[in-house]
Amino acid sequence: MNNPIRILLTAALCLLTVHTSFAQQAIQSLAGTWRFALDPENRGTDGCWFNTRLAESVTLPGSCEQNGFGVRAVEPTVGKLTRVVRYEGKAWYQRDFDVPQKWAGKRIELLLERCHWESNVWIDGKSVGTQNSLSAPHLYDLGALSPGRHTLTVCIDNTYKIPIGTWAHAITEDTQGNWNGIVGRIELRATDPVWIRDVQVFEDHLQVKLGNNTGKPVSATVQGSSCSIPAGGISVKLPFAPNAKAWDEFSPALHELDVVLKAGKYGDRKTVTYGLRKLGTKNKQFTVNGRPTLMRGPVDECVYPLTGYPPMDKAAWMRVLSICKSYGFNYMRFHSWCPPEAAFAAADELGFFFQVEIPLWTMDAPHFGQHPERDRFIVDELDRILEAYGNHPSFALMAMGNESAGTLGELVQKGRSADPRRLYRCENGDTEQDGDFFETGQRGIAGPRTDWDRWSAGGWIAGGENDGVNRTTGAPVPTLSHEVGQWAMYPDFDEIDKYTGTLRAYNYEGYRRSLAERGMLDQNKDFARASGLFSVLLYKDEIEASLRTYPHGGFQILEARDYPGQGTAIVGWLDAFWDSKGLIEPKEFRRFCSPTVALLQMPKRVYTCDETFRAVAEISNYGPKNLPVKPEWTLADESGRTIAGGSLPATVAETGKVSGLGEISAPLRTVAEAARLTLTLKAGGTSNSWNIWVYPARQPETPAGVRIAYEYDRTTRDALARGERVLLFSDPTKGLYKIDRVMLGPDEIRLFEVKPGQNALEGTFMPAFWNMRLFNQVGTLGILCDPAHPAFDGFPTEAHSDWQWADLLGRFSAAESFRTAGAPPSYCDEREKTWGDVRNRSKAIVLNGTPDDYRPIVQVIDNYERNYKLGSIFETRVGPGKLLVCAMDLDTDAANRPAARQLKSSLLNYAAGDRFDPQFELPEELLERVLTFEDEK
């Protein structure tokens, strides 16, 4: 704990601290072995099971599933993890406990930290009551119990009786699942019959709830002030003016407050840990203690596969949040669920901001305001969350569920009135209702199914001059970019062995079998790494676009780790266990995601050697203070040779702002050959880098001995029969599958099968968004190639997709994507008129049926649902001839497409050279099927 300060709120403390009545509450843990019975037919209450000694046994804390009780899975679920055993209904938990003699006359409280989700309690066969919360502890006042042995019976019912939405992450089968059990602390706590029920620490006062079980009014003193506590209890407001260090992300100072109650022979003391921080908004930014703050962080979807529920201990959350901080994050959004006390305690200590949400997602549930019983539960849940976790300085933002509908503004008003220590939002992904901040789908990069407003004329901006979220600047309050990312990548099947708990990765096993059946299982690691590295590039660009935006509230990444539900979304550079996949080190990630980041605005990534590279340097500074900077930059090739470099004028980067550093200019005429260059910008103790590609300005010439063809027709086949070398450009607009499925749900999908005349998938630079089960899209995951292959001698590349491939592989038609997503026709028509149709720059030809060890030169990584062998560039012998196939349009507008010209030149030189020596001869039937079309036969 940082800077502990104990503030003792009574003038007579020196006397009170030695009075036994004022000792901290006595606690007895009930963790351990409990008697148990399942009640699938709901007979227990009528059968008085609370008076029956239950026959089975389980260990608590835990769940039915952890203890092996429930219906064992017969068939694996396809679109998510599979619970080994599953149970929905009532389950009975029972144990004996002893009340010590020293507790005689005491009030005893039962705490069940987290139940899933309704609990009913009996003591010695007598009903105590019922509690119903997914977010806060269930607390039962047992009154005074006689010393000696007693029997406690708890019935937990996880039946879906309150329609909060089956997609809500507090219960959804796509994440933790609707488990039955009791986790966290399970304990008895003894107090005097007059006690401190709760203390809330506000900026200038304390709100103290006092309980009184004596049945009559009691005179008491709290903080030296007298009050009368009526039977039942009272809430009192007490003055509070601490003189202590404030809490923030850079200096998370925590303090302890002792509140002491004296009521005659009764008394109590409650110790509260708190942090002093003032959260607000100004100029469309969040402020913490008056300083602008940018929220940067992932979404926690409650994916904890070993237990099926979130960790309840502080050490586990220290690990999770320390990992997040190592990647430069300072914020976490809990998607339609609330974390436990241990998470807040860890965040307080580490200086981390939480966005908590009520358990609501109305996708398949009534809108708020349409279901009175459910609405009462949600209102009560809001109150419970604010009381249980309100003192935590990490608890900064509160949203009313995820992407829900209804009169949610009522909840915002209620939250503001009850607890102004945090900021409130109606729900996520919407800007139409009342809120202290907005969330919107504005993105750094436009993908095939992301937001509608981020598209530029080119389809995306890769480190571009657009800030990436500029459309949010009209909002009157801070705006958070909602669920940025969701770029799919290929799974690494070695992770399957890590699923040893209540949830198993049978979905991954199915994908692995499919890949093996296609003869490509040996490529699993390559697919995972190439698609993963590509995804990291996209995350970098999105994050930087958000950081360039000013003023702005921040961004939430969906997700830093994989989400093995909702159709199976492999989207993280971490796996579902928060373990690194080895795609990027935290130190490298922090170069573009941290409080202070060097940034660059540049109009494009591909240049010719007769151009001058120009860019605008900036720095985003949300550090603790203004930062003197002396910017320096270098432009170097892959060998480290400096092409150009220089310094920019020294300046001071104000905290809470994006500051311009100056313009960078570098003539590229000294770059004689095709090259990838790296621009590195250093400023204020930080550095960041970006790749650009520089190509010769000349048009490629066709070398002798190579025939260029555009159809696999009789002329082409005759040339091959004569032993000629042919570079065939297959029309990327022909032979395509029709992508026409609609959303069927995470456990249903209509996959594409080979049909006559449909032998390729539409090419796209961007990878799949989330997954194919939920969104209509081509679904491919980037490319895989061998950079050392001689076909790339004149076209430098990595093994994975990078920005120089963007123009070659093609981009989704914005208008068509919008139509598929259900956007208004007028909106789509306008976008189509403005931008035109930029699809069909390439296609991915289906090469199923080729030998297992046959590999295309440019292999398109297919979605793990389909696992087709796909190629955009491949080669084969055809009798005595040699055929090189390129399914990319490298000719259209070639004068303005340097990458297209350069790739064509590289392929021509390869086809003319000695190293063009295809090792396979693909069947003529296959070539005719994938390379000929009805109008060419």
Regions found by a protein language model. Name each.
Residues 67-99, 103-123, 129-130, 193-200, ...:
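Active-site-adjacent substrate/metal-binding segments within catalytic domains
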Residues 321-322, 331-574:
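Substrate-binding/catalytic cleft of secreted carbohydrate-active enzymes
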Residues 735, 770-898, 916-937:
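Catalytic beta-strand/loop cores that center a nucleophilic Ser/Cys/Thr
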